Amino acid sequence: RLCIPYIIPC
């Protein structure tokens, strides 16, 4: 799954 720090947590 996509993870983007501060936007989409892992």
From Swiss-Prot:
GO molecular function, one term: growth factor activity
Keywords: Amphibian defense peptide, Disulfide bond, Growth factor, Secreted, Vasoactive, Vasodilator
Annotated GO CC locations: extracellular region
Localization annotation: Secreted
Tissue specificity comment: Expressed by the skin glands.
UniProt keyword annotation of Cytoplasm present: no
Record GO biological process: defense response; positive regulation of leukocyte proliferation; positive regulation of smooth muscle contraction; vasodilation
Superkingdom: Eukaryota
Disulfide bonds, paired cysteine numbers: 3-10
Function: Induces mouse splenocyte proliferation and guinea pig smooth muscle contraction through binding to CCK-BR.
Protein name: Signiferin-1
Species assigned in the record: Crinia deserticola
